[in-house]
Swiss-Prot record:
Catalytic activity: uridine(38/39/40) in tRNA = pseudouridine(38/39/40) in tRNA
GO molecular function: RNA binding; tRNA pseudouridine(38-40) synthase activity
Function of the molecule: Formation of pseudouridine at positions 38, 39 and 40 in the anticodon stem and loop of transfer RNAs.
HAMAP family associated with the record: TruA (MF_00171)
UniProt key word tRNA processing: yes
Keywords tagged on the record: Isomerase, tRNA processing
Name by which UniProt lists this protein: tRNA pseudouridine synthase A
Organism: Phytoplasma mali (strain AT)
Gene3D superfamilies, per database record: Pseudouridine synthase I, catalytic domain, C-terminal subdomain, Pseudouridine synthase I, catalytic domain, N-terminal subdomain
Length: 244
C-alpha cells in the first residue's frame, strides 16, 4: 500500500501545553495533533514527527511536522478540516504533499528563534508572548549577543546531559528594536535543550550589571567552568522559521 507523506507548518500558543513532544498523561502539541488527525482520518496510530521539540510554554509561528497517510486528501480541504477541529491556540498555516524521503527533523538545515522583550509593563491582553523586566541596559545586550555568533561549545548553556557534541553554529544573532519591543533574533544550525533560554538569561544578567561581557565570552570559550543558572521565561521565546 502506498503511503503519502504530508508536511505541515503550524503556529501555536504554547501557554497551556507541556511542550511539543508527547508525554504520558500531559497536554502537548504533538498529542493534540495526533488525536485530531486520528479522528478526522479514522486512523488509529498516526505518528507525527516534529522538527523542534519546544519546551513547556514556548510558542511557534513556524514549527514543521510530518506524518504519513495511506490515502490522499486534497491539501486545501485537509487544512480547513484540521483547523476546524484543532483548538484555537493551534493552527495549521500550510500543508504540502512531499516526498516520502522527507524528514522534518533530520533534514532541517537551520532554525530562527525570537525572544521578545516589552518596553512597557504587560497587561492582560499582551502578557502571553513577551517578557517585561525593568532596569535593563539593552545596549549591553546589543554588544554581548554578537559573541554568540560562530561555532561554540554550548555545554555551559544547556540542561541537556551526556551529549556527544555540544557544538553548534550560530549564523546570526542580533537585536531588532521597535517602538514597543526588543526582539532578540538568533539563527543557528540547531539548538540543544534550554540553550536559547540560558543564553538569554545570561544576557539579562549582563543588562542588569550582575554579569560581565568578559564572563560571557569566557564561558562561550570554555575558559570558565561554571554553568549558566538563569533560565529566561519560556513565554518570551518563539520558534519563527525552519529552513530546509
Amino acid at each position: 500500500m502506498k503511503d503519502f507523506n504530508y508536511k505541515l507548518v503550524l503556529s501555536y500558543d504554547g501557554t497551556n501545553y507541556y511542550g511539543f513532544q508527547k508525554q504520558l498523561h500531559l497536554n502537548t502539541i504533538q498529542s493534540v495533533l495526533e488525536n485530531v488527525l486520528n479522528k478526522i482520518t479514522k486512523q488509529k496510530k498516526i505518528k507525527i514527527y516534529g522538527a523542534s521539540r519546544t519546551d513547556k510554554g514556548v510558542h511557534a509561528s513556524g514549527q514543521v511536522v510530518h506524518f504519513q497517510l495511506p490515502f490522499l486528501i486534497p491539501n486545501d480541504h485537509f487544512q480547513k478540516i484540521l483547523n476546524f477541529c484543532l483548538p484555537s491556540d493551534i493552527q495549521i498555516t500550510k500543508i504540502i504533499l512531499i516526498s516520502k524521503e522527507f524528514h522534518c527533523r533530520f533534514q532541517a538545515k537551520s532554525k530562527i528563534y525570537h525572544y521578545v522583550f516589552s518596553k512597557k509593563k504587560l497587561n492582560v491582553f499582551n502578557y502571553r508572548f513577551q517578557v517585561y523586566i525593568p532596569n535593563m541596559d539593552f545596549n549591553k545586550i546589543k554588544e554581548a549577543i554578537l559573541f554568540i555568533e560562530g561555532k561554540h561549545d554550548f555545554s555551559l548553556f544547556t540542561s541537556q546531559k551526556s551529549l556527544k557534541n555540544y557544538q553548534r553554529i550560530i549564523f546570526k544573532a542580533f537585536i531588532k528594536e521597535t517602538k514597543q519591543k526588543y526582539f532578540l533574533i538568533i539563527h543557528g544550525n540547531s539548538f540543544i535543550q534550554h540553550m536559547i533560554r540560558f543564553l538569554v538569561g545570561f544576557l539579562i544578567e549582563i543588562a542588569q550589571n550582575k554579569k560581565t561581557l568578559s564572563e560571557f565570552k569566557q564561558m562561550l570559550d570554555l575558559k570558565i567552568n561554571q554553568k549558566a543558572r538563569l533560565l529566561a521565561p519560556a513565554k518570551g521565546l518563539i520558534l519563527k522559521k525552519i529552513f530546509y
